């Protein structure tokens, strides 16, 4: 399972870890990512989404149905 949000397509970034001496080493900035179950009223079923905290805020803001339609329209999520 890749750590990519199914709603916002947010994924980890690469950058530098900078010491006080300005010595830089490559590191990875991970996303605040988790799996969560939602009850989809329109289809009358439970769905499991791999989402970031930003994706959860989007669902809370515009609703699950609108977020799923928006993500599937952009090609982030495939609905059967």
Swiss-Prot record:
Region (Disordered): 1-21
Pfam assignment, any one: Ribosomal_L28
Alphabetic keyword roster: Ribonucleoprotein, Ribosomal protein
Keyword Ribosomal protein belongs to the record: yes
Gene Ontology terms: biological process: translation
GO molecular function: structural constituent of ribosome
Any single Gene Ontology cellular-component annotation: ribonucleoprotein complex
Family: Belongs to the bacterial ribosomal protein bL28 family.
NCBIfam families, sorted: L28
Protein name: Large ribosomal subunit protein bL28
Organism phylogeny: Bacteria, Pseudomonadati, Bacteroidota, Bacteroidia, Bacteroidales
Protein's gene: rpmB
